[in-house]
UniProtKB/Swiss-Prot annotation:
Required for maturation of urease via the functional incorporation of the urease nickel metallocenter. The keyword Lyase does not apply. InterPro entries: UreF (IPR002639), UreF_sf (IPR038277). UreD, UreF and UreG form a complex that acts as a GTP-hydrolysis-dependent molecular chaperone, activating the urease apoprotein by helping to assemble the nickel containing metallocenter of UreC. The UreE protein probably delivers the nickel. Keywords: Chaperone, Cytoplasm, Nickel insertion. Its main location: cytoplasm. The keyword Chaperone applies. One of its GO terms (molecular function) is nickel cation binding. It is found in: Cytoplasm. HAMAP family: UreF. The lineage of its organism: Bacteria, Pseudomonadati, Pseudomonadota, Alphaproteobacteria, Rhodobacterales. This is Urease accessory protein UreF. GO terms for cellular component: cytoplasm. The gene is ureF. Belongs to the UreF family.
Length: 210
């Protein structure tokens, strides 16, 4: 395994200090309302977010950031695509924490940007295949949502791992498609997930930031 790939794996690890564990992407609301109540419904919910929501849009933004597209313009797109205040907070806070940590490790100048753009700027010099970077990012995103479901549904640890494993084929497909997608392909249709993010903003009892 190359040093470049190991660096990317480290950056996308749950141990990397982006605070990802504190964000449920609206999943907490879906669980509290009974829409996500077991491993099967968690898998469906997360698969839809990956294929039709932020998973896909972030993957396309990341692909273009890796290829050197204007990071300022990509950041504006990322912000515009956030369907709720908490989603915007989620991508900006994690992106800022990610950029600050990678900058401290590498000595590079990495300004705070939405997470997919920050990751793309950081990972571009690694020279890794675009689809491979996208797949690892999507896997990290899915793993974080599965972790939220394990804690809050709750699911058993083995159920959680089985849920994540079942998403692997779809992650590979989305990564391959997004690696070649133009910016004109940006858009989402995860309407229930977007509504969950909006409803979470006024949820009285919660343990996640989003």
């Amino acid at each position: 395994m190359s040093a470049a790939l190991l660096s990317l794996v480290q950056w996308l690890s749950p141990a990397f200090p982006t605070g990802a564990f504190a964000y449920s992407h609206g999943l907490e609301w879906a669980i509290s309302e009974g829409e996500v109540r077991d491993a099967a419904s968690a898998r469906r919910w997360i698969a839809d977010v990956l294929a039709f929501g932020a998973g896909r849009t972030d993957a396309i933004l990341l692909a273009h950031a890796l290829r050197g597209h204007d990071p300022g313009a990509l950041s504006d797109l990322a912000r515009a695509l956030a369907p709720a205040a908490e989603r915007l907070r989620e991508t900006e806070e994690q992106g800022a924490a990610f950029a600050a940590t990678v900058a401290a490790l590498t000595g590079r100048d990495l300004p705070p940007r939405p997470l997919p753009v920050a990751l793309g700027q950081a990972a571009a010099p690694l020279g890794l295949p675009v689809a491979e970077v996208l797949a690892l990012m999507l896997h990290a995103f899915a793993a974080n949502l599965v972790s939220a479901a394990v804690r809050f549904v709750p699911l058993g640890q083995t159920e959680g791992q089985a849920t994540l494993a079942a998403l692997h084929p779809r992650i590979g497909e989305i990564a391959a498609e997004s690696a070649e997608a133009p910016l004109d392909a940006l858009g989402s249709a995860a309407l229930r997930g977007d509504l969950a993010a909006m409803r979470h903003e006024t949820q009285e009892v919660r343990i996640f930031k989003t």
